């Protein structure tokens, strides 16, 4: 086994490359003598930077090209941000490892103001996420939410150029890229419930490659896997993707799991919430239970409106 090479499919963004290098280092540490190389590529989501993700429509905007590389044997594993991974996989592929989660919170970044509450009336806030927009506008309906796409460096540069009073980014990405000092304040999960899987890195590979599954085993983090499993079950039951106003966050409490879920109108003012506590061994069922509770409260109408505006999913 030590003589073979593992090829990692990855996007070319700085954060994606960091994640791939992290997996590479972990594999080499766990399996001395194993050769690991990167296969960088550009996804559709990386190319379509002039439109909000919610307007592009479709799922798997950041993973499809990587999955094609796996299916065509141009790579052996693909490394993803879990919040970008669709709920269903192409035949022959599957998720076989979830690494330990980084800080899952959203980060408030500003050169002028200390926190969201400190923003003056009518301030311009940049985000590419309908999930963040729904929660921001419910809390602060006076804010102007402006479209913000691009990699982390690009988004920070736009803030520094004065295009925004503040921007909201995932804390995990800033921390991983060495920009932790740019986090003005972390937004609590009570004020901005994260996206399912936010802060976690997942590894996809061919279902038939049992030898690779064994190599990935030391990288798998059980607690993160249980939490993300519950979050993804909620997302799947709501037919969610990475560009819809769905939030969910699970934490472990001993042998139990506490899952909170949210669906919000991107225009603000209508946040539907639900939560459940139960045995962590029932993670998938708990996710479905919270999703159904949200649907019972009217989440379907909000999501249908968003899907209609985005085009086919």
Swiss-Prot record:
Residues bearing the modification S-(dipyrrolylmethanemethyl)cysteine: 242
Pathway(s) annotated for this protein in UniProt: Porphyrin-containing compound metabolism; protoporphyrin-IX biosynthesis; coproporphyrinogen-III from 5-aminolevulinate: step 2/4
GO-annotated cellular components: cytoplasm
Domain of life: Bacteria
Classification via CDD domains: PBP2_EcHMBS_like
A GO biological process held by the record: protoporphyrinogen IX biosynthetic process
Swiss-Prot/TrEMBL keywords: Porphyrin biosynthesis, Transferase
GO MF entry, a single one: hydroxymethylbilane synthase activity
Name of a matching Pfam family: Porphobil_deam
Family per record: Belongs to the HMBS family.
Subunit field text: Monomer.
Protein name (record): Porphobilinogen deaminase
Gene: hemC
